[in-house]
Structures are given as structure tokens and as C-alpha cells.
């Protein structure tokens, strides 16, 4: 079998869901429940994740050319020290497959991310157990998300202004009678740092932008 495009997921205000934490956001996304984030304007100091201008559905081979560029998203209104959890799910699949996943993300300010497999059990998608090797409990960390109210402040040059990149591979579980159904769920937890101590009146925006490309080889 050949490696084929499966799906591109991007930050937006329709398919991304909020939660009190990453686990709840992931459950909400997997089951299309809860509330969606707000779009926020790009702040001047933020980079922007964008496709090439000619990467469109009109090209001979552009598997994700019809997917719009990602939005900057947040749970408005933003506040100092605020932490917001987001998640998005893939389409449902059943056939055992080898998957390749490529993630690129930026957040103001600190973020954690996790990629998990969910399975439809009874009437609900829940986190699959055990998780396939390559997903498991690996938590991606950028910045220091856990201490904003203890004094982490934005200082120049801002040490959080990096675009983060990650990739992984995994094999989905066996499905001999074709009754099992799965989803890939990407979740984030993003923290807005406190304003710079010597410039307390400066604006303190918050936002998340991401793309995740998924390819697979059906076994």
C-alpha cells in the first residue's frame, strides 16, 4: 500500500473545542461537544503560519490545498496569567494503518501539547488504552506553563517567540472484524505570562496558532 494524505487540522473557531484542561478539551473535541474558541488578531510580534501562496486546490498535487490557513485563537477576553486548553480531532477511521504526524505550532506564551488516540466505546469516544507507541503519554512542553502567577513575566527579548515543530509515527490497533472506530486528537494548554514588571501598561495579548498534517499507509 502507498502512503496517502489523511488530513490537515488547523487552529480555527469551528472544529477546535475548549476545556478546563487538556483532558477535558480532548474529550470535548473527540465528541464535538462544548464551546469553541474566539479568533484573535495577530499581534505585531507574533509570527504567522501560512501556506505557500500557490498551495491551492487548483494545483495538480496539493493534498491540503483546500484547507485554509490557521487562525489565531483564544478564549476571550484574555487576562494576565490565564491558562486555556484547546483540542481538535481527526476524521474517524477503522482500517489498521501506519500514521505519520507533523505538527507546527506557535503560542503566546507557554504551551503544552499532546497527541492521543481515541476510540469509540459504547456511545462515546474515549482515550484508547493502551496508547500506541509514538503517542502514549508524551507531553510536549514549550516555556514554563505551570508558574505564571508566581512571577514569570515577559521580558525583552521575549524568550517565547519560537515556532515549535514536532513529528511522530504510530500504528493504529488491529481491527479484524472492522468494528472498531478511532480518532486522533491533538490538545494544547496555553498560558499567558504576566506583563513585564517595568512596563505594566503594555498590551498583554494571548493566542495559539497550529497546523498538523497526517499521512497514513493502510496495512
Provide a role label for each language-model segment.
Residues 110-132:
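Short, surface-exposed beta-strand/strand-loop-strand elements in extracellular ectodomains
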Residues 1-115, 140-219:
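Beta-strand-rich recognition domains
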Residues 126-146:
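Local beta-strand/beta-hairpin segments that build beta-sheet-rich folds
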Amino acid at each position: 500500500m502507498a502512503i496517502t494524505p489523511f488530513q490537515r487540522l488547523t487552529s480555527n473557531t469551528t472544529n477546535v473545542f475548549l476545556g478546563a484542561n487538556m483532558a477535558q478539551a480532548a474529550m470535548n473535541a473527540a465528541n464535538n461537544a462544548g464551546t469553541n474558541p474566539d479568533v484573535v488578531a495577530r499581534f505585531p510580534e507574533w509570527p504567522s503560519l501560512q501556506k505557500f501562496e500557490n498551495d491551492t486546490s487548483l494545483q495538480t498535487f496539493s493534498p491540503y490545498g483546500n484547507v485554509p490557513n490557521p487562525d489565531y485563537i483564544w478564549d476571550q477576553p484574555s487576562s494576565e496569567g490565564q491558562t486555556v486548553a484547546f483540542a481538535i480531532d481527526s476524521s474517524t477511521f477503522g482500517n489498521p494503518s501506519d500514521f505519520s504526524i507533523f505538527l507546527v505550532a506557535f503560542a503566546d506564551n507557554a504551551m503544552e501539547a499532546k497527541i492521543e488516540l481515541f476510540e469509540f466505546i459504547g456511545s462515546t469516544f474515549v482515550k484508547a488504552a493502551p496508547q500506541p507507541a509514538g503517542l502514549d503519554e508524551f507531553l510536549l512542553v514549550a516555556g514554563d506553563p505551570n508558574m505564571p502567577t508566581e512571577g514569570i513575566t515577559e521580558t525583552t527579548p521575549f524568550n517565547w517567540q519560537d515556532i515549535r515543530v514536532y513529528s511522530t509515527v504510530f500504528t493504529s490497533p488491529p481491527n479484524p472484524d472492522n468494528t472498531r472506530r478511532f480518532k486522533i486528537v491533538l490538545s494544547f494548554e496555553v498560558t499567558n505570562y504576566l506583563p513585564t514588571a517595568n512596563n505594566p501598561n503594555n498590551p498583554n495579548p494571548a493566542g495559539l496558532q497550529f497546523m498538523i498534517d497526517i499521512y497514513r499507509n493502510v496495512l
